[in-house]
Amino acid sequence: MKKVGVIPNINKDKDLEVTKSVVKWLLEHDSEPYLNEIVASKMGYDEYGKKSTDIYSKSDFIIALGGDGTILNVARLCAPFGTPIFAVNLGHLGFLTEVDMNEVFVSLDKIYKGEYTVEKRMMLEANVVKNDMEIINFRALNDIVITRGAFSRMARINAYVNNNYVDTYLADGVIIATPTGSTAYSLSAGGPIVYPTVEVIIITPICPHTLYSRSIIVSPDDVIRLEISEENQDLMITTDGQQGYKLDYRDIIYIKKSNEYTNLIRVKNTNFFDLLRDKLTER
């Protein structure tokens, strides 16, 4: 019997009708759905309610129902266990999602027949160090961003790669992105589009106050060090636009490729460049 986690975005599936239809399909195919305890209770499936850790660590795969934001959240939770994600789009853009809702059951049939591949996506790891002590760490599938607050002045951030000085960014912030994240915030800030399965790290300043500052692409083996080099800077570090931490003067942020990957289930032979044109045109 397969154990399948089902993670809905309840803001996009408000009445949980989509989730119920997926759970029904799983039960009809001799599978045990693993649901968040609150969601399970709302649906009348208390017996399938599980602790969050059990959902991500014990499921054979996860069905994520939502948009790219849902996938980014699920990806960070799945990564320590390597649990594959089948991403179903209930949003409007869906760069990361594999299928729309009208394709979900045909696609699940394919998965159960073994007609799928698993695509590995590189992730980033960030560690914030204060007074020589690690304070907090993050993982991200898309990007790690240092940005100024709503009313603060221009940020001043010293950047190094493998202890080699790169630049002092006078900007609204700096984006450190994966190839997956190259079509997200980094793209809006003028960064390059990178094929998603290539492994590189992209450094993109946000609105730099200079004539020459451009994105830099470095090796996945490189370690990026960012230093908050001036007092009275209202700066935040955020990961995938979902987790955040306030930074202080002299804080140091180390960013490198994570040892963990996001594993995305693929049932379609989608051409990345077709997807790129379609999704960016939709915007």
Curated annotation (Swiss-Prot):
Q: Name one GO cellular component term.
A: cytoplasm
Query: Where is NAD(+) annotated to bind?
Result: 68-69, 142-143, 153, 172, 183-188, 242
Name a GO molecular-function annotation.
ATP binding
Give GO terms for biological process: NAD metabolic process; NADP biosynthetic process
Kindly report, in one word, the top-level EC class recorded for this enzyme: transferase
- Major subcellular location class: cytoplasm
**Protein name in UniProt:** NAD kinase
